[in-house]
């Protein structure tokens, strides 16, 4: 396995924003899940989305 684990896009079907419960968009370049309604970007580390508001980046 390489140093980067890819995010499985099928997870987007089950994941929602923890703030708004709205759907998320995947930013492959930045390895983030984007909540447009909450204006937050949740990081993906080693293929695992970190869905903690405290870890999110404000947009």
UniProtKB/Swiss-Prot annotation:
Pfam family, one: Trm112p
Assigned protein family: Belongs to the UPF0434 family.
Gene Ontology cellular component list: cytosol
Annotated organism of origin: Cereibacter sphaeroides (strain ATCC 17023 / DSM 158 / JCM 6121 / CCUG 31486 / LMG 2827 / NBRC 12203 / NCIMB 8253 / ATH 2.4.1.) (Rhodobacter sphaeroides)
Name of the protein: UPF0434 protein RHOS4_00640
